[in-house]
């Protein structure tokens, strides 16, 4: 008799806990479904899930879609360079876009080799 009374008391208290927690779980699930926004990959236009999400220059990518435009090598956040919304590995970015020419000319100065040419002429006139 003692066991039957204990079992009867345990059942209602357990049901009360279960009923309250299931309604709480349902509310939190419905809230989280409304809060999620589908994000699409800038490269393939497919849905990006949080585990594969990568953001570079305010664009969202799958980690597998974030690759060099020139050689298609997979990029990481520390190994890319961007120009006009296109992404490149650092070696190809330098190869494709580095400035060709002389820095001295770019800043309006005489070329370095011209400065040395004048110094070679001057030592002959120098007196020791």
Swiss-Prot record:
PROSITE patterns: LIM_DOMAIN_1, LIM_DOMAIN_2
Keywords per UniProt: Acetylation, Cytoplasm, LIM domain, Metal-binding, Nucleus, Zinc
GO BP term, pick one: actin filament bundle assembly
Binding annotation for Zn(2+) 2: 68, 71, 89, 92
Residue span, LIM zinc-binding domain: 39-99
Domain of life: Eukaryota
Location, primary (coarse class): cytoplasm
UniProt xrefs under Pfam families: LIM
Compartmental location: Cytoplasm; Nucleus
Positions bearing N-acetylmethionine: 1
CC terms in the record's Gene Ontology section: actin cytoskeleton; cytoplasm; nucleus; plasma membrane
Binding site for Zn(2+) 1: 41, 44, 62, 65
SMART domains attached to this UniProt entry: LIM
Region (Disordered): 1-25
GO molecular function: actin filament binding; metal ion binding
InterPro entries, A to Z: LIM_LIMD2, Znf_LIM
Function: Acts as an activator of the protein-kinase ILK, thereby regulating cell motility.
PANTHER family, per the entry: OS06G0237300 PROTEIN
Subunit structure comment from the entry: Interacts with ILK.
Protein name, entry field: LIM domain-containing protein 2
Gene that produces this protein: LIMD2
């Amino acid at each position: 008799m003692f066991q039957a009374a204990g079992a009867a008391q345990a059942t209602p208290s357990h049901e009360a806990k279960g009923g309250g927690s299931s309604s709480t779980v349902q509310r939190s699930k419905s809230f989280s479904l409304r809060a999620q926004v589908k994000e699409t990959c800038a490269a393939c236009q497919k849905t990006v899930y949080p585990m594969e999400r990568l953001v570079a220059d305010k664009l969202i990518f799958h980690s597998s879609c974030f690759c060099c435009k020139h050689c298609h090598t997979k990029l990481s956040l520390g190994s890319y360079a961007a120009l006009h919304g296109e992404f490149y590995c650092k070696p190809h970015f330098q190869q494709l876009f580095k400035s060709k020419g002389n820095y001295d000319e770019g800043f309006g100065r005489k070329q370095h080799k011209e400065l040395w040419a004048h110094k070679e002429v001057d030592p002959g006139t120098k007196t020791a």
